[in-house]
Amino acid sequence: MSDRLFIFDTTLRDGEQVPGCQLNTVEKIQVAKALEQLGVDVIEAGFPVSSPGDFKSVVEISKAVTWPTICALTRAVEKDIDVAAEALRFAKRGRIHTGIGTSDSHIKYKFNSTREEIIERAIAATKYAKKYVEDVEFYCEDAGRTDNEYLARVVEAVIKAGATVVNIPDTTGYCLPDEYGAKIKYLMEHVDGVHNAILSTHCHNDLGMATANTVQGVLNGARQVEVTINGIGERAGNTSLEEVAMVFKSHKERDIITNITTNKIYSTSRMVSSLMNMPVQPNKAIVGRNAFAHSSGIHQDGVLKNAQTYEIIDPKDVGIDDNAIVLTARSGRAALKHRLHVLGVDLEQEKLDKVYDEFLKLADRKKDINDDDVLMLVGKDRTATHRIKLEYLQVTSGVGVQSVASICLNLSGVRRYEAAAGNGPVDAGIKAVKKAISNSDMTIQEFLIQAINKGSDDTGKVHMQVEYNGATYYGFSANTDIIAASVEAFVDAINKFIVD
């Protein structure tokens, strides 16, 4: 029988501590609802005593969310616990997360206390929280640097006092995976009554070990993991939810299951990235833009024959439509043939060989090759079959002036002229296009601008991800005018789903 692993998401508490990533209450509720749909078991909604904003967020999230447990953080201080309990009064399932530092450095320098006094405070805080809620989690701050024998005494004491979950944080990201795993194993073997509670991991990524430490913790007995979307968090971040979920989905032989609906991972990642204005690293595992992109010719050939040759995860399992074959100078004939086929062009081998020679010459000059380049090599225009074409664009913008865009779209031979004001020239152009096609239901999920070369007069390329009717479409354009490139990319994406 598989072991159930509980997912405790702290994106809205620990994750939001990243400078510049603060959310308002409405945005926090939006994230909380997405986490509920994703299938997390516990949402740490905030630290109520820290600010009126955090208090309000915990209250409103408690009202808005139905299934996950809503957790509020406190110190081992009665006032903190009182405020947390008040904030959780509307929660269908509430949890108070209280605790104190247990490492010698915390005991001596932070609390000017002794080991015995810390245990007494830990017991008192746990019992006090139990007056309000049945579900009490206790954290042993800096457990990663706490010696195992003393840590076991603390854990045993708070479990006897009524803690239902005990959190073993590697607060500073100091532990190596074997050390952290051994720590959890020691507690499982030496704490009397350990099976009356759940041990939880909470790992930071200061040395890049957060996910590895978390996995080792689980393999040694922890059954709750504290994680964030995209691994965001203080300093170098926290354990990534998507990484842990996919580790155990991929390694079914471990018989550890979560409640995560994995095909919602990518959309949740992008939503959090957008709301927090924190881009996802392109090579980030699971959710990075390049996570399922292949540019090596050998890899491309293998993936085209069978994706399992170089992919251990089906992109659809995390909510990505397909892998990406990126054309570069390292790409082989198989990749070029595949891209041409996708674009509706099938060539005989002799013709393909000639086109491939020209492709290599072009690829040596350009960083990567887009669809326009590929079609140019075979004498075709990608936009020739587009139902919608941008024929004219003029934008006025400046300091102290509202941006206004005027456009002419050719819709299957019929010209439509429109103008719109917006928050900047790109927004104005997008709004004008939406007016011209009488459709404003599509939303931009991702908007990436890159310089192809150096210098202010060189070409910029725009990649745009557009969502419409629950499906995702991609648009691309390159132009020395970055505003024009942005609007062209939007029109390119629209042409993928607009039909007669």
UniProtKB/Swiss-Prot annotation:
Q: Does the keyword Kinase apply?
A: no
Q: What class of enzyme is it?
A: transferase
Region annotation (Regulatory domain) maps to: 389-500
Q: Which InterPro entries match?
A: 2-IPM_HCS-like (IPR050073), 2-isopropylmalate_synth_dimer (IPR013709), AIPM/Hcit_synth_CS (IPR002034), Aldolase_TIM (IPR013785), LeuA/HCS_post-cat (IPR054691), LeuA_allosteric_dom_sf (IPR036230), LeuA_bact_synth (IPR005671), PYR_CT (IPR000891)
Keywords in alphabetical order:
Amino-acid biosynthesis, Branched-chain amino acid biosynthesis, Cytoplasm, Leucine biosynthesis, Manganese, Metal-binding, Transferase
**Binding of Mn(2+), residues:** D14, H202, H204, N238
Supply the PROSITE patterns for this chain: AIPM_HOMOCIT_SYNTH_1, AIPM_HOMOCIT_SYNTH_2, PYR_CT
**Domain spans labelled Pyruvate carboxyltransferase:** 5-266
Q: Which domain of life is it from?
A: Bacteria
Q: Choose any GO biological process term that the UniProt entry carries and state it.
A: L-leucine biosynthetic process
The catalytic activity of this protein is classed by the Enzyme Commission as: 2.3.3.13
Where in the cell?
Answer: Cytoplasm
Which pathway is this protein assigned to? Amino-acid biosynthesis; L-leucine biosynthesis; L-leucine from 3-methyl-2-oxobutanoate: step 1/4
The cofactors it requires, by name, are: Mn(2+)
**Reaction(s) catalysed (UniProt annotation):** 3-methyl-2-oxobutanoate + acetyl-CoA + H2O = (2S)-2-isopropylmalate + CoA + H(+)
NCBIfam families per the UniProt record, alphabetical: leuA_bact, PRK00915.1-3
What's this chain's function?
Catalyzes the condensation of the acetyl group of acetyl-CoA with 3-methyl-2-oxobutanoate (2-ketoisovalerate) to form 3-carboxy-3-hydroxy-4-methylpentanoate (2-isopropylmalate).
Protein name, per record = 2-isopropylmalate synthase
Natural source organism: Parabacteroides distasonis (strain ATCC 8503 / DSM 20701 / CIP 104284 / JCM 5825 / NCTC 11152)
